[in-house]
Amino acid sequence: MLNSDRIKWNRKYRSRREVFSAHPSDIVCNFYHLAPHGCALDIAAGNGRNALFLVQKGFSVEVLDISEAGLKMVAGRDPKVRAACVDLDVYDIVPRRYSLVLNIRYLNRRLFPQICEALIGGGVLIFETYLKHPNFVPQRPHRDDHLLRINELLLGFLKLEVVYYSEKMAAAFGEPYPMASLVAIKR
């Protein structure tokens, strides 16, 4: 990721104009319980809303993000959260370490195989991000490489046992947006 991305996200997290939810993602609330307790990884954690929820549920959590400003919102709030400011375009995820991996509203296809390897046996992946849909024109444009293609998320994690998958409209940025959601277990 470019330094410009770090600057952009730091600016967004420091701005009072941008409002980021403090509530955990619905998909995390609905499926975290499938994972054995242990260490969770929150990729592109932003303000840490999902990590803080998981700590309340008994997990220790490692959070990764490009933005120091975003990580400051979660770092130090609980000793079970460890934050690391990293460039996910070059960072390598530790293999066979996590009982739960979250990837919410972020896409880096290079990480797909690493995410599979990061899970311990019985570990759970919860992944949800934006989807390019031919019948939808967003109010806020996204770069095509930041959008999943139809069925791409499902096909990207065939090594795991998929327990939930959907492609549907969901709320994002105050408007409906096509999202792909996946929950899968490493057997």
PLM region descriptions:
Residues 1-35, 38-46:
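Conserved class I S-adenosyl-L-methionine
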Residues 78-90:
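Conserved SAM-binding strand-loop segment of SAM-dependent methyltransferases
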Residues 91-100:
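A short acidic, Gly/Pro-enriched loop at the edge of an enzyme's catalytic core
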Residues 74-75:
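Conserved SAM-binding loop
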Residues 123-134:
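Conserved beta-strand signature within the Rossmann-like core of class I S-adenosyl-L-methionine
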Residues 67-69:
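Conserved SAM/SAH-binding beta-strand->alpha-helix loop
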Residues 169-187:
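Core SAM-dependent methyltransferase catalytic element
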